Curated annotation (Swiss-Prot):
Family according to the record: Belongs to the peptidase M20 family.
Record SUPFAM superfamilies: Bacterial exopeptidase dimerisation domain (SSF55031), Zn-dependent exopeptidases (SSF53187)
Binding site for a divalent metal cation 1: 82, 93, 193
GO annotation, biological process: amino acid biosynthetic process
Top enzyme class: hydrolase
Pfam families according to UniProt: Peptidase_M20
pH dependence: Optimum pH is 8.5.
Listed name of the protein: N-carbamoyl-L-amino-acid amidohydrolase
Cofactor(s) the protein needs: Mn(2+); Ni(2+); Co(2+); Fe(2+)
Taxonomic classification: Bacteria, Bacillati, Actinomycetota, Actinomycetes, Micrococcales
GO MF annotation list: hydrolase activity, acting on carbon-nitrogen (but not peptide) bonds, in linear amidines; metal ion binding; N-carbamoyl-L-amino-acid hydrolase activity
Binding site residues for a divalent metal cation 2: 93, 128, 385
Record function comment: Catalyzes the hydrolysis of aliphatic N-carbamoyl-L-alpha-amino acids to free L-alpha-amino acids. Is strictly L-specific since it is inactive toward N-carbamoyl-D-alpha-amino acids. Shows a preference for aromatic N-carbamoyl-L-alpha-amino acids, such as N-carbamoyl-L-tryptophan and N-carbamoyl-L-tyrosine and, to a lesser extent, N-carbamoyl-L-phenylalanine and the non-natural amino acid N-carbamoyl-L-thienylalanine. Carbamoyl derivatives of beta-alanine and charged aliphatic amino acids are not accepted as substrates.
Annotated catalysed reactions: an N-carbamoyl-L-alpha-amino acid + H2O + 2 H(+) = an L-alpha-amino acid + NH4(+) + CO2; N-carbamoyl-L-tryptophan + H2O + 2 H(+) = L-tryptophan + NH4(+) + CO2; N-carbamoyl-L-tyrosine + H2O + 2 H(+) = L-tyrosine + NH4(+) + CO2; N-carbamoyl-L-phenylalanine + H2O + 2 H(+) = L-phenylalanine + NH4(+) + CO2
């Protein structure tokens, strides 16, 4: 008997079909609890049922397709990703992982695979936070890390809360606690995802073996000088807030390059007030997004930034404050899962390398309740969160084969 393998053509067809469920505009915009979400939900549920999975939704709308095992006492082995998107994003981010999970389920069905553990194939909601500004909400719910009060405090731009939107969508957000999983009922979770960076493609590597997910620190720096007339205020009498702010940005860049361990820093937002072409800048606010797979690197970097900002401001005769408004620690994935992914890629003779994820994923929260492994596949030119996002479908097929092999290894 010839065993069936994952098919790139089926993966492509399903990803393209799901990409149609998008709000108007470039790329894919599929926000949570919208008509576009509803259409994708219907398609995914139908695909799960066609793969002989029993289907249920939890309180927030995570869709769980389940293939029962021969030993009902064993905890489930799960695979999945998210199916929401950023605004005007691409058709692969998250969705590729969901589709490849379903392709794995189809291959198991076609080959008559008999699994001991229950297998679950999960499509997760609201990872991006594009509607409610709270990333990885669905993954946090699976990990039992969403507080009931968040269902009311998290609102969209129209003031609609998660609780209101989920209820209108036909869900029961009041049953939030029942969505939480534990090691007792979840043996492991595997997530296939596009890399969203350039490393695999540049090095011509087929599979990324994710070892860690970066921690994130977000800082807001406020520099306050004095606004004056641009033509009548001598240079030596100015309290221009922009000049020291620019030096601060340059120094942060220097600090990070000195660390040279995968840590990165980005100034993604900067405002200058009053903002007139003939006015000396009186106030400058900018954000710093700091990411690293190493907690110690983040701690040292923040300490250096805080000292530097104070020194630069003092020398320039301006005031400055640093406020940390987001803190997420790095996650080291379970060594047993990292080894399983690495061994699967080797057995399939796919080129592979260890890699740290520079983006956050649901997996980093699910890792708090069970062992987690991640499989990366290449992103063309490293582009993601844009309409031009692209991953070759044959690379997704290879990733699916790795996932299948890992699931079977865990099932032994």
């Amino acid at each position: 008997m010839t065993l069936q393998k994952a098919q790139a053509e089926r993966i492509e067809k399903e990803i393209r079909e799901l990409s149609r469920f998008s709000a108007e505009g470039p790329g894919v915009t599929r926000l949570t609890y919208t008509p576009e979400h509803a259409a994708a939900r219907e398609t995914l549920i139908a695909a799960m049922k066609a793969a002989a999975l029993s289907v249920r939704e939890d309180a927030l709308g995570n869709i769980i397709g389940r293939r029962e095992g021969t030993d009902p006492e064993l905890p489930a082995i799960a695979v999945g990703s998210h199916f929401d998107s950023v605004r005007n994003g691409g058709m692969f981010d998250g969705t590729a992982g969901v589709v490849c999970a379903l392709e794995a389920a189809r291959v198991m069905l076609e080959n008559g695979y008999v699994n001991r553990h229950p297998f679950e194939f999960i499509a997760i909601v609201e990872e991006e936070g594009a509607r409610f500004s709270s990333g990885m909400l669905g993954g946090r719910a699976i990990a039992g890390l969403v507080a009931d009060r968040e269902l009311d405090s998290l609102v969209d731009e129209d003031g609609v809360s998660v609780r209101q939107a989920a209820t209108a969508f036909g869900l029961k957000p009041g049953e939030l606690q029942a969505a939480a999983r534990s090691a007792a009922d979840l043996r492991a979770f595997i997530e296939l995802h596009i890399e969203q960076g350039p490393i695999l493609e540049q090095e011509q590597i087929e599979i990324g073996v994710v070892t860690s997910i970066v921690g994130v620190r977000a800082l807001r720096v406020a520099v306050k000088g004095r606004s004056d007339h641009a033509g009548t205020t001598p240079m030596h009498l100015r309290q221009d807030a922009l000049v020291p702010a620019a030096l601060m940005v340059r120094e942060v860049n220097r600090f990070v390059n000195e660390i040279a361990d995968g840590t990165v820093a980005t100034v993604g937002h900067l405002t200058v007030a009053p903002g007139g072409g003939n006015q000396v800048p009186g106030e400058v606010d900018f954000t710093l997004d700091l990411r690293s797979p190493h907690e110690e690197s983040l701690r040292v970097l923040i300490d250096r930034i805080s000292v530097m900002v104070g020194e630069v401001a003092s020398q320039a005769g301006v005031a400055a404050d640093v406020d940390e408004f987001f803190n997420l620690s790095p996650v080291q994935l379970a060594p047993t899962m990292v080894d399983a992914v690495r061994e699967a890629a080797s057995a399939l003779q796919f080129t592979h390398r260890d890699i740290s994820s520079g983006a956050g994923h649901d997996s980093m929260f699910i890792a708090q309740v069970t062992d987690v492994g991640m499989v990366f596949v290449p992103s063309r030119a490293g582009r993601s969160h844009v309409p031009e996002e692209w991953t070759d479908f044959d690379d997704l097929r290879k990733g699916t084969e790795v996932v299948l092999r890992v699931m079977k290894a865990l099932d032994r």
